[in-house]
Swiss-Prot record:
Pfam families: HTH_8, Response_reg, Sigma54_activat. The gene is zraR. Keywords: Activator, ATP-binding, Cytoplasm, DNA-binding, Nucleotide-binding, Phosphoprotein, Stress response, Transcription, Transcription regulation, Two-component regulatory system. Coiled coil: none annotated. Its main location: cytoplasm. InterPro entries: AAA+_ATPase (IPR003593), CheY-like_superfamily (IPR011006), Homeodomain-like_sf (IPR009057), HTH_Fis (IPR002197), P-loop_NTPase (IPR027417), Sig_transdc_resp-reg_receiver (IPR001789), Sigma_54_int (IPR002078), Sigma_54_int_dom_ATP-bd_1 (IPR025662). It is found in: Cytoplasm. One of its GO terms (cellular component) is protein-DNA complex. It comes from the Bacteria. This is Transcriptional regulatory protein ZraR. Phosphorylated by ZraS. Gene3D superfamilies: 1.10.8.60, 3.40.50.2300, Homeodomain-like (1.10.10.60), P-loop containing nucleotide triphosphate hydrolases (3.40.50.300). ATP binds at residues 172-173, 329, 359. Activity of the ZraS/ZraR two-component system is repressed by the zinc-bound form of ZraP, which probably interacts with the periplasmic region of ZraS.
Amino acid sequence: MIRGKIDILVVDDDVSHCTILQALLRGWGYNVALAYSGHDALAQVREKVFDLVLCDVRMAEMDGIATLKEIKALNPAIPILIMTAFSSVETAVEALKAGALDYLIKPLDFDRLQETLEKALAHTRETGAELPSASAAQFGMIGSSPAMQHLLNEIAMVAPSDATVLIHGDSGTGKELVARALHACSARSDRPLVTLNCAALNESLLESELFGHEKGAFTGADKRREGRFVEADGGTLFLDEIGDISPLMQVRLLRAIQEREVQRVGSNQTISVDVRLIAATHRDLAEEVSAGRFRQDLYYRLNVVAIEMPSLRQRREDIPLLADHFLRRFAERNRKVVKGFTPQAMDLLIHYDWPGNIRELENAIERAVVLLTGEYISERELPLAIAATPIKTEYSGEIQPLVDVEKEVILAALEKTGGNKTEAARQLGITRKTLLAKLSR
């Protein structure tokens, strides 16, 4: 793994203490960032890579234990050292139980501090817990669920290699985020990452985008253009929705991968390229091969390493963290003070099935923040499809008829729309006639 200097985040609401630590740590060769509150620390961890966090326990608003837990939720691998006054050693023990790697007594013994820092960083390298040169949170990959931890482990293992990767998952699960993390954590990270959505272009435009074209090769080609393969030379090429390309483009892409060279449209000259290829699709390419719609040889070339993206409903325990992440982002963007979600609103978010996955959650939170007039997001600000979600309770042994469940959802939708049957039907994705028929059963 290629690394630069070690980045340390110091979290303490004592500005003078922060300044002293910053000067000391910089003298030891570390890069140092300062956060004067827990909320500031979380904002920085979301945006930047840190190899270690040094956090005080006693802080106003959000104390060190709460900050520790939130940082661990964003990035379970990051080592955190807690600073505490001698009189609060019990709190330090609590911090260790919550995931702190070690604690330091204030006023700090600088020799002990240096020794503890070196041990913490060495421990992280030895255990392999260190995220590579970019943290998951930096790419919006937030969560502590088993499914998310499995995905992050796969990225950490696969990123250093040059193997072609095929990412499969439903729309909105974050396939491009994984591609960006794989590139950023690779030895090619200082070279370009070039992306292309194959489904957005017809065959002729896709060929020109991938391989480039000569001046005059077709109508409108008023100058020569390099393709995405050449632009990505030395770096990574990410092809999204690879399952949507035509049979002819499959042949040309296969040749480029096999020969490691491309040919501009309208040219006989070949150009050697060195790229790592990452492809993504929502389609089952094995099924597409069986159906004769996708070349088997290209499938094998792409499917060297397969990464399966979990849907949001497979990692419901991550929804509160993701919702909070989006809430903070959109509250800041809209210059609003939003303190959080009501318990009822969070229950709805957790129980909704999210067919659009993380992208749908992000859009729902943005809408809620824009519509919000108070301090807490409630079910009133959520889209109707989410607000009408039945909250699943502990199974009582009695099966409720499907017709009753449907009626409950429709009644909730009608309440939400003030009795407007047409609007309720529209937001539920059914016709008004179907809604009336289900109500009359």
